[in-house]
Amino acid sequence: MSDKNKKVSAFAAYRGSATSKNDVQKGTKNSDKNGAAKNNNNRNLASKNGGKQKGPPKKNGSYSDGDNGSSSSSGEDEEDDSTDSSDEYESSESGEEYTLNSHSSQSSPETPANTRESLKRRNDEAEGSNPIGAKRTSSTPVGQSTSAARSTQQPKAPSCPLQRRSCPLPSKKNTVPVKVEVASPDRALLSPQSIKKEPGASMLCRIKIGLVKSVQPGGDAGAEAGAGQAVNRLEPCHKVHKENSIEVGKRTLAQLIAPMTMATFLRDHWEKSPFRVKTTTSGGFSNLISFKMIDQMLIQNHVEYTTNIDVTSYEDGVRKTLNPDGRALPPSVWAHYQRGCSIRILNPSSYLVQLRQLCVKLQEFFHCLVGANVYLTPPESQGFAPHYDDIEAFVLQVEGKKRWRIYAPTKELPRESSGNLSQTELGDPIMDIVLKPGDLLYFPRGWIHQAITEKDSHSLHITLSAYQQQSYANLMEKLMPLVVKESVEQTLKLRKGLPLDIFQNLGVANAEWKGAHRQKLIQHIQNLAQRLVPTEGQIDRALDQLAIKFQHEALPPTIAPQELKRTVFGAQATADRNGHCSLDYELAEGTAVRLLRANIVRLTVDEGVLRCYYYTDNGLEYCKYEPNFFELEPFHGTVIETLIHAYPEYTKIKDLPPMGNDEDRLEFVEALWERGILMVEKPFKKL
């Protein structure tokens, strides 16, 4: 392999047209539409100058811990890695996970990323809803607040405001690290507790309504598998770098709904009926959000009304949004709360790392964006009208109590959320329950719901939302245009002109006429439609279009300490007194690599062009940037396809498909690693 400081990575070497054999240019989906790819989306795979980044990492959005020096080896070292569980990364925050591409630039309401309209938001969005399109806005430090008038005494909550670490990737702007709550992968998202299942409540309805109760240790074991056992803490495996991210997401969901098993949930409740997990212990979700965390979030970040926070009320059957203009600072927010208004935080995962970690884990299992909204409601208040949503909702009660009434759907599995409904439209509730701290409530899309706090308690809850626009209908919307387009090329009858008298026989004005000629035309069109049968390849390409949507919407991955020392995000660069830069890593033919996450990339073919989409570079806002992708030659695609099928196992570079020569293959794999797409099995030793 050539000199490390002189070698240029394969992806970085070709920055012009994608027509040459080795061209692997990174582009944007809408470059033709915009005339040229946006500058901030043309981030090269190796560095902005086409080669490796030389020089020490900057502090403006780059990883800057000078003590992180545990890196670099050829990867061929056969050292036993069983000590990883106790192997600190020479950092005082060894349990901290790092979030990629925070892009901490202050948001402006006038920019497209901050406009009120969103693919998934409506003015009549209501409390159980977490429109997945809610903007995920980046954060900017604004210093300490000298005063924060509060209407209620804040409960104590864990607070460890550390500087956020962002990784050495090209940033949109020079930014300053932001103080946020830092999550430890060794801290449980759920409190340990023993659990059992109660029999379902008797309902005058043949729909299965679940009631699952967790009890103190020593309680009776229920019929549900796993009852009487302690809920597993959401702790990482000792071999975090060897785990399958889909299985991690599945395990996380299983712990949320325990003691109900995943099999029971998917068979009896998923997209079918609601259920509640009732706990007898409090504090199950208290490390995800609290009054104190909200207060610190408002102080430390530029959070705006309408973009990031809504102030709402519901009185006398009328729902109102009472948002002021501008930034939402603590005195203003708490004053609204004291007057009886509900506070909805639209993108808390942009600011709260532990909540973001939960969403990131679940999105791998659901293969779609998992959003989060936070709702804070004062005593004896209701912030939203009855309504139904177009998402699968998981309500996590954090503080206080809230009464929920759930009504049977008027339309099963709707594709869009409802407007505000009146009380006269509801009928009798199927469920009428009070959620307490640690309780969880699930209800499918289409189930009407409303919630109100009781006289003696406020409420703080999180709504996780998933599976928005993930139906067969969405797949068919992508598929049928492909079928029509390709069928036209193969079927002469589809290319023939319409009859000259078709306007006089078809259309709404002619619907009552049942003449023979009209019926003949209708029959002919129906026969043509029956020829439009999708091929296997068309179905694959349509599904890839849905997968591109996920790549665009997904939250960037959070990086555990064990992963940090195996990825580019923990790499260090040093320079001597003469300014000569050296890196602390080097890949070799014997280095074993794998994808960072199961769904981190998606290979697609569009108009004969092979592309690889990835979400490592996504921002924390919803669709802040154009989709990230680079274009490939077939032999590049074969390498990525091999890595996809090998996941979660590691593959040595020398065992990947050949690519011209070994040097080309090594440079290509190294370019993927430098983009944050790959992880090595063994931590690098110092060179």
Swiss-Prot record:
Span of domain JmjC? 347-483
**Compositionally biased region (Low complexity):** 33-50, 58-74
Query: Bias category Basic and acidic residues: which stretches?
Result: 23-32
Cellular component annotations (GO), alphabetically ordered = nucleolus; nucleus
Protein's cellular compartments: Nucleus
- Which of UniProt's keywords are assigned here? Chromatin regulator, Dioxygenase, Iron, Metal-binding, Nucleus, Oxidoreductase, Repressor, Transcription, Transcription regulation
Annotated spans, Disordered: 1-174
Q: Name one GO biological process term.
A: negative regulation of DNA-templated transcription
Annotated Fe cation binding sites: H387, D389, H449
Q: Where is the composition biased (Acidic residues)?
A: 75-96
Q: Can you tell which superkingdom this protein's organism belongs to?
A: Eukaryota
Predominant place of localization: nucleus
How many cofactor units bind, and how? Binds 1 Fe(2+) ion per subunit.
Q: What is its cofactor?
A: Fe(2+)
According to its UniProt record, the EC number is 1.14.11.-, 1.14.11.27
Molecular function via GO: 2-oxoglutarate-dependent dioxygenase activity; histone H3K36 demethylase activity; histone H3K36me/H3K36me2 demethylase activity; histone H3K4me/H3K4me2/H3K4me3 demethylase activity; iron ion binding
Residue spans of biased composition, Polar residues class: 100-116, 136-156
Name the chemical reaction catalysed here: N(6),N(6)-dimethyl-L-lysyl(36)-[histone H3] + 2 2-oxoglutarate + 2 O2 = L-lysyl(36)-[histone H3] + 2 formaldehyde + 2 succinate + 2 CO2
Family under the similarity heading: Belongs to the ROX family. NO66 subfamily.
Q: What does this protein do?
A: Oxygenase that can act as both a histone lysine demethylase and a ribosomal histidine hydroxylase. Specifically demethylates 'Lys-4' (H3K4me) and 'Lys-36' (H3K36me) of histone H3, thereby playing a central role in histone code.
Name of the protein in its database record: Bifunctional lysine-specific demethylase and histidyl-hydroxylase NO66
